[in-house]
Amino acid sequence: MAGHSKWKNIQRRKNAQDAKRGKLFMKLAKEIYVAAKMGGGDPTTNATLRLAIEKAKSANMPNENIERAIKKATGNQEHTHYEEIRYEGYGPGGVAVMVICLTDNKNRTASNVRVAFSKNGGNLGETGCVSYLFDRKGLIVIARENLHIDEDDMLLQAIEAGADEMETTEDSFEIYTSPEQFEQVKNTLAAQGFTFATAEITMIPQTYTTLTGDDLTKMLKLIDMLEDDDDVQEIYHNLDESMLE
């Protein structure tokens, strides 16, 4: 992971989301709805819902939107059934791609994802064809701007909180945890006064791929096309983050 800052990828994703805020809120509301429907509407006892709410708040989603999604999921009205589906494949130049969807129509979603890959030099594969190239980890990113702590002290606090490792970039401290320790580390650091640019359980590539020219152009178009799909919740890939600048 060394040298591959997640900060650029996060910034790009947030900038793209800012430009499509209505679509983003719809996707976040769907995630909250599914979490509340599956595990109940109380975030203190539903960890999946708690993480979905925190994710929505970090995107500045209004509280009334969050509450509406929970109420819809826990009310007596007819429910929409969403199914989580994971698609795996390769983008141009052999970039590994995983696409996580929440859909009420598997045929529509499969068709849209397949078209996005085929139009941009990629190929969908079987389940498991690229997931082994990623590790599921907690990621906590703390921006270094206006932060008065050096790398050694930050590393010590992160490790004492239960983190596995930390990377330092020019812009940020990037703290990695096991999925099981994620909430403990996040809550401990928050109690110490740290605020987070992002805090999520995500998929971290084991290795990275660099692209140039037409392959890079097509890969960026593939990411954009998938992000525009209402059914797509998350896109994980191992394109080198420097390619996203």
From Swiss-Prot:
Keywords: Cytoplasm, DNA-binding, Transcription, Transcription regulation. Residues 1-21 are annotated as: Disordered. Residues 1-14 have a biased composition (Basic residues). It holds the Pfam family TACO1_YebC_N. It is found in: Cytoplasm. NCBIfam families: PRK00110.1, PRK12378.1, YebC/PmpR family DNA-binding transcriptional regulator. Belongs to the TACO1 family. This is Probable transcriptional regulatory protein Aflv_0709. GO terms for biological process: regulation of DNA-templated transcription. GO terms for molecular function: DNA binding. It comes from Anoxybacillus flavithermus (strain DSM 21510 / WK1). GO terms for cellular component: cytosol. InterPro entries: Integrase-like_N (IPR017856), TACO1_YebC-like_2nd/3rd_dom (IPR048300), TACO1_YebC_N (IPR049083), Transcrip_reg_TACO1-like (IPR002876), Transcrip_reg_TACO1-like_dom3 (IPR026564), YebC-like (IPR029072). Its main location: cytoplasm.
